[in-house]
């Protein structure tokens, strides 16, 4: 089968690797344009571009797909199928209708829940116990197409968004392999989504990581887990930004001002919340290394009674 692959970040690499290893003819890879990054503003290739070039696959990096020349390029490649994984651009109707077998997408949630760009983070932030991968046919709506396969996984109680991301990107490749097998054998029974059950997972912003201490300890812990590795949950201690990387919920009937440091132990900081106590175990101040509270307290002080967030 002749396939065009569209993807950009690290999450999209295992699916491309699987297609290459399975012997499909990848006639072209579409990925986002290179972006400058770092102090020298050096142009960085996307992870998908790196993988495609390593296998001598033609790479296309249009700023938009809504362009006649781009449409002609795609048409000339004569794809039987277009596979889209975290590409970062909306496909216009003309492209969706081009391949014989349509366009399919690998999405990192159990649709119709968590449509959008940030499903991996939001399932953890919202305290979900399970998530998974859904493959679907694409239509003009955002993640609204008919579903092909779903595979479910449990979310670990301590699992971070970064760890879940790495698990799901490999699961995505497995589910894509099964999906393409069904397409090749003409065995697909696509299921429409129940749009009334849909939820949305918007892309994350830096401000999302700011901790509201009036929330319960478990809600704050979920925010911490769900924003690792980026943007990372943070608060303020004596005017300095303090990122929090690891925490534990301690059940308590204590009624205190949310955000108040109620105790400082040798390896943790105990903080009052809207419900229960949060034990902070790993922190990072601006310009400093991430470290355990035990190590931080060797040469620094955290004062009991201070209010975090001020």
UniProtKB/Swiss-Prot annotation:
NCBIfam families listed in its UniProt record: fmt
Family to which this protein belongs: Belongs to the Fmt family.
UniProt cross-references to Pfam families, sorted A to Z: Formyl_trans_C (PF02911), Formyl_trans_N (PF00551)
InterPro entries with a match to the protein in the record: Fmt, Formyl_trans_C, Formyl_transf_N, Formyl_transf_N_sf, Formyl_transferase-like_C_sf, GART_AS, Met-tRNA-FMT_C, Met-tRNA-FMT_N
Gene encoding the protein: fmt
SUPFAM superfamilies in the cross-refs: FMT C-terminal domain-like (SSF50486), Formyltransferase (SSF53328)
Organism lineage string: Bacteria, Bacillati, Bacillota, Clostridia, Peptostreptococcales
Enzyme class: transferase
PANTHER family: METHIONYL-TRNA FORMYLTRANSFERASE, METHIONYL-TRNA FORMYLTRANSFERASE, MITOCHONDRIAL
Protein name: Methionyl-tRNA formyltransferase
CDD domains: FMT_core_Met-tRNA-FMT_N, Met_tRNA_FMT_C
